[in-house]
């Protein structure tokens, strides 16, 4: 268990590290605006990518929908449940940082559900198109970086979200191939 002193030291260390990452961006409003646009834009891309994947499954073999929807939904629900139970604070709550991405609300930081969803969708695409899956994996990494640079997640939040999302998407794709 982490003591208050160790936790304070850890938070101070993260504040310093975050400011090293964010300082070059803070002085450039256009870059901060671009960070927010990329963050939001990639989320929209993943909504569309998931809809297209499900459309592809409907056309190619409707049985593929079961794992592509079911496994992803179970993973999403499990991550959401864990986030509520664990209720980890966000960086701007426990550290003295000013996030570059505006976000209302508190807690539920671990793991990152945006990152989970992006990696789950990207990995699921391997059943339909490897090149699209690879492009989406790159976009998922960019989203994870945006969430950390934006100050709304700690690196551990996005790493764990990426791992769980990748495993969920890989399982969904594997089961879809079997059908």
Regions found by a protein language model. Name each.
Residues 47-56, 138, 170:
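Hydrophobic core of alpha-helical transmembrane segments in multi-pass integral membrane proteins
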Residues 54, 74, 78, 82, ...:
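Alpha-helical membrane-inserting segments
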Residues 30, 61-64, 91-92, 129-134, ...:
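Membrane-helix interface segments
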Residues 52-78:
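Interfacial segments of alpha-helical transmembrane regions
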Residues 44, 48-51, 71-75, 161, ...:
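Hydrophobic alpha-helical membrane-embedded or membrane-associated segments
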Residues 1-50, 63, 79-107:
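N-terminal transmembrane-helix/juxtamembrane module of multi-pass inner/ER membrane proteins
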Residues 96-179:
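Membrane-embedded catalytic cores of phosphoryl/pyrophosphoryl-handling enzymes
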Residues 49, 63-71, 132-135, 156-160:
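Alpha-helical transmembrane segments of integral membrane proteins
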């Amino acid at each position: 268990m982490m003591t208050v002193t160790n936790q304070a030291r850890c938070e101070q260390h993260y504040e310093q590290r975050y400011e090293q990452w964010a300082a070059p961006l803070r002085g450039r409003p256009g870059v901060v605006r671009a960070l927010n646009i990329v963050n939001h834009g990639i989320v929209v891309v993943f909504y569309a990518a998931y809809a297209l994947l499900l459309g592809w499954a409907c056309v190619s073999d409707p049985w593929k929908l079961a794992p592509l929807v079911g496994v992803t939904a179970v993973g999403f629900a499990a991550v959401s449940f864990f986030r509520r139970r664990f209720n980890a604070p966000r960086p701007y709550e426990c550290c003295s940082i000013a996030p570059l991405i505006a976000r209302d609300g508190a807690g539920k930081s671990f793991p990152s559900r945006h990152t989970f969803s992006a990696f789950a969708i990207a990995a699921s695409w391997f059943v339909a198109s490897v090149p699209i899956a690879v492009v989406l994996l790159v976009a998922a990494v960019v989203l994870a970086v945006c969430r950390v640079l934006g100050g709304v997640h700690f690196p551990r939040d996005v790493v764990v979200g990426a791992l769980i999302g990748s495993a969920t998407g890989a399982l969904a794709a594997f089961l879809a191939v079997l059908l």
